[in-house]
C-alpha cells in the first residue's frame, strides 16, 4: 500500500512593510487591482495584515512575501516567509 501524503496549500501574498515598530511583528500593506463592476475602471484595493517576523529582520519599506499560519495573536495570522527586496536607504 502506498501512503497518500496530502500537502495543505498555503496562501501567500506579497506586500510592502509599512510599520515595524512592534516587537516580532510587522504591518504589511497588500495591494491588488480589481475592475469596478459598474464603471469598468481598474481600481487599486489594499489590505493591511499583521505578520510575524521572528528575528526582527524586516524594516519599513521592504517588499516581503507572507504566508498564512495558525493564529499567533488576536490580529496576527500571517508569517513573513521571505524578504524579496530590501528598502533603499536614501
UniProtKB/Swiss-Prot annotation:
InterPro entries: NA-bd_OB-fold (IPR012340), Ribosomal_uS17 (IPR000266), Ribosomal_uS17_bact/chlr (IPR019984), Ribosomal_uS17_CS (IPR019979)
Keyword annotations from UniProtKB, A to Z: Ribonucleoprotein, Ribosomal protein, RNA-binding, rRNA-binding
Pfam family of the protein (one): Ribosomal_S17
NCBIfam families tied to this protein: PRK05610.1 (NF004123), uS17_bact (TIGR03635)
UniProt record similarity statement: Belongs to the universal ribosomal protein uS17 family.
Subunit structure: Part of the 30S ribosomal subunit.
Record-given protein name: Small ribosomal subunit protein uS17
Protein encoded by which gene: rpsQ
Amino acid at each position: 500500500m502506498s501512503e497518500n501524503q496530502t500537502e495543505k496549500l498555503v496562501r501567500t501574498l506579497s506586500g510592502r512593510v509599512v510599520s515595524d515598530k512592534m516587537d516580532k511583528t510587522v504591518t504589511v500593506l497588500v495591494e491588488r487591482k480589481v475592475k469596478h463592476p459598474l464603471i469598468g475602471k481598474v481600481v487599486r484595493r489594499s489590505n493591511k495584515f499583521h505578520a510575524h517576523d521572528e528575528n526582527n529582520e524586516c524594516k519599513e519599506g521592504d517588499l516581503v512575501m507572507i504566508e498564512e499560519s495558525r493564529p499567533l495573536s488576536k490580529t496576527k495570522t500571517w508569517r513573513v516567509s521571505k524578504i524579496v527586496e530590501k528598502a533603499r536607504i536614501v
